[in-house]
UniProtKB/Swiss-Prot annotation:
It comes from the Bacteria. Keywords: Cytoplasm, Protein biosynthesis. This is Ribosome-recycling factor. GO terms for cellular component: cytosol. The gene is frr. GO terms for molecular function: ribosomal large subunit binding. It is found in: Cytoplasm. Belongs to the RRF family. Responsible for the release of ribosomes from messenger RNA at the termination of protein biosynthesis. May increase the efficiency of translation by recycling ribosomes from one round of translation to another. The lineage of its organism: Bacteria, Pseudomonadati, Pseudomonadota, Betaproteobacteria, Burkholderiales. SUPFAM superfamilies: Ribosome recycling factor, RRF. It comes from Janthinobacterium sp. (strain Marseille) (Minibacterium massiliensis). GO terms for biological process: cytoplasmic translational termination. PANTHER family: MITOCHONDRIAL RIBOSOME RECYCLING FACTOR PSEUDO 1 (PTHR20982:SF3), RIBOSOME RECYCLING FACTOR (PTHR20982). Pfam families: RRF. Its main location: cytoplasm.
Length: 186
C-alpha cells in the first residue's frame, strides 16, 4: 500500500458513508408522499422475499397518496399486507387492482421524533467518517514504520485526509439541514 492508496481508500469509504446516509435519510418519512418510502418494503413472491419495486409499479397519485399497482392480480392482497406490516405507519386501501397508500400528515411530536432520528443517522455517519480517518492514519503510520514513506509525507497525507474528513462532515451537515427542513415543513 502507498500513501496514494491510503488516501484513495479513505475517500472511497467516506463517499460510501455519505451514500449510506442518503439511503437512510430517504427512508425517513416527511409530510409529503414520495415513492422512496416504499423502497425497502419486501413482498413474499413465489416463496422468496422480493423488493416491492420488482413486483409492482409504484407512482405518486397526488401530494399525499402513493399508488401501487402489482404486475399480477393475485399479488394485490400480498402487496397490501406487506405495506401494512412494514411498520411505516401507512394504511393501504385496495381499489380493484390499484392499492392507494395515503400518507397521513405528521403530528408536531412525530416531526420532532423524525428530526431526532435524522440527527442520530447523521451522527452515525460522522462517526463512520472519523473511524475511516483513524484507519487511514494508522495505515500511514505503518508505511512510515516499514520505511515506505517519510514522516513528512505521512504528515502531508494526514493533513489531506483531515481536509477530506472535514469536507465529508460538512456534506453530512448539509444533508441533515435539508432533511430537517423537509421534515419540519407542514
Amino acid at each position: 500500500m502507498t500513501v496514494a492508496d491510503a488516501k484513495k481508500t479513505a475517500d472511497q469509504k467516506m463517499q460510501k458513508s455519505i451514500e449510506t446516509l442518503k439511503a437512510d435519510l430517504a427512508k425517513v418519512r416527511t409530510g409529503r408522499a414520495h415513492t422512496g418510502i416504499l423502497d425497502h418494503v419486501m413482498v413474499e413472491y413465489y416463496g422468496n422475499p422480493t423488493n416491492l419495486s420488482q413486483v409492482a409499479n409504484v407512482t405518486l397519485i397526488d401530494a399525499r397518496t402513493i399508488g401501487v399497482q402489482p404486475f399480477e392480480k393475485k399479488m394485490v392482497a400480498v402487496v397490501e399486507k406487506a405495506i401494512r406490516e412494514a411498520d411505516l405507519g401507512l394504511n393501504p386501501a385496495t381499489q380493484g387492482e390499484l392499492i392507494r397508500v395515503p400518507t397521513p400528515p405528521l403530528t408536531e411530536e412525530r416531526r420532532k421524533e423524525m428530526v431526532k432520528l435524522v440527527k442520530s443517522e447523521a451522527e452515525d455517519a460522522k462517526i463512520a467518517v472519523r473511524n475511516i480517518r483513524r484507519d487511514a492514519n494508522e495505515s500511514l503510520k505503518k508505511l512510515v514504520k516499514e520505511k515506505a514513506c517519510s514522516e513528512d509525507e505521512e504528515r502531508r497525507a494526514q493533513d489531506e485526509i483531515q481536509k477530506l474528513t472535514d469536507k465529508f462532515v460538512i456534506e453530512i451537515d448539509k444533508l441533515v439541514v435539508e432533511k430537517e427542513k423537509e421534515v419540519l415543513t407542514v
